Amino acid sequence: MRRAASRLRVQGIRVLALSVLAIGLCISRSAIAQEKAPRFRVVVLAEQGGIHKPFVDSATEWLNALASQNDFAVDYIETTEKIDDAFLSHHQLFIQLNYPPYNWTPTAQAAFVRYIEEGRGGWIGFHHATLLGEFDGFKMWPWFSKFMGGIRFTDYIPGFADGMVTVENPSHPAVKGVASPFLVQKEEWYTWSHSPRANVHVLASVDEKTYSPGTKVKMGDHPVIWTNEHYKARNIYVFMGHHPDLFQNPAFATIFRNSIFWAAHQDENP
């Protein structure tokens, strides 16, 4: 009887140990599966060095925190060398973080055009993305100019200025919940050959009368946030993106966050 009871106890211990091991393996596999399957994946083409580095560094820190909180993954690249159809197929959102629309490889250009025109993913561009013209020995990219409303860069405010931005379409998901107007400080407001309004859906514009200090660098009707609905991809251009303190601006941070989830088709439950 004692031996039988002893054997039963040993068998019970073994069963318990195997059960604990099985549970542990299930938990481990579940954790690994979650790590391998983020909610969605973002690629960030970020300009490095020069005057834009502080903003890009702040954006990277902010993005990493947002990604951790919302279970999406971010991959950073600093050149267009990796960009092709296969690379972009792994990303539901492309963020052009102050990277200009020139110095792209031909393969990257062609893949990006397909990505946007066929709606393979979403796009958010900041600031330098409308530096359209002939720069650093590169010709203007005509397709990208059309994508941005047919504009060409003409001038900017080198000494920076504060300005009040008015939300024109508060019902759009990208600007939902943003107080209007809101102040943007220390920005080097660009001017373009003309307003893109006729070719895009304007979400917000800057009131040039509110520039402080005042300046002669103006263009009249001055959109600063817009989307081009002629393309299948959900896309947002946000002009602001020079000063790192923008991430302390609730309006800017909200627009960036909203735009990510909207452009990546995740806005149903951000």
Regions found by a protein language model. Give the residues of each.
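A glycine-rich, often tryptophan-bearing local segment used as a flexible ligand/cofactor-contacting loop or short
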Residues: Y102-G177
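N-terminal secretory signal peptides that target proteins for export/translocation
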Residues: M1-Q11
